[in-house]
Amino acid sequence: NVSALKRCYVGLIHRVNNVSAPRLPLKSYEDKSSFKIFAVDIGLLGAMCDLDSDTIVRGNNIFTEFKGALTEQYVLQQLKLKHEPFYWSKPNARQEIDFLIQTNGGIVPIEVKAEENLKAKSLKQFVLDNHPDTAYRTSMSDYRQEEWMTNMPLYCVPVI
């Protein structure tokens, strides 16, 4: 029950709603029945999941499975400073864009990667289908401008 969850975690979570279509304005396509929940802070998320520093430093199997969630959490925290992020998933398909933001009269898709694995099939298909002016992939890789998107190192996410 979402309302019970809200009462229990009021002030501790961010809710990121899906949009039914990647069109302007994003808010008018918001689907409040489909959403992702994030902690308000990456440290709080780690504490809620009993993630200790040894797990992060040593990179054991638990962290290998969890670092994608931590990376998405970090990116959301940075985006929330300037934007209202949404996400988008294609109905009945495996295509999902981690975050969509509306800025400068356009929609910007953002794909989040935890490592340097730079496959971004969903992002590439989104760009082909929707022709945004800007598309970002965030990762541990260096800044790189490609023909169809920009790779932003995770430390540069605040400038998006």
Predicted regions and their residues:
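Catalytic cores of nucleic-acid endonucleases
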Residues: 114-152
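Short catalytic-loop micro-motif centered on adjacent basic/acidic residues
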Residues: 87, 109-112
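C-terminal tail/extension regions appended to the core domain(s) of diverse proteins
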Residues: 151-160
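Accessory nucleic acid-recognition modules appended to NTPase machines
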Residues: 1-96, 100-104
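Structural motif
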Residues: 106-108, 134
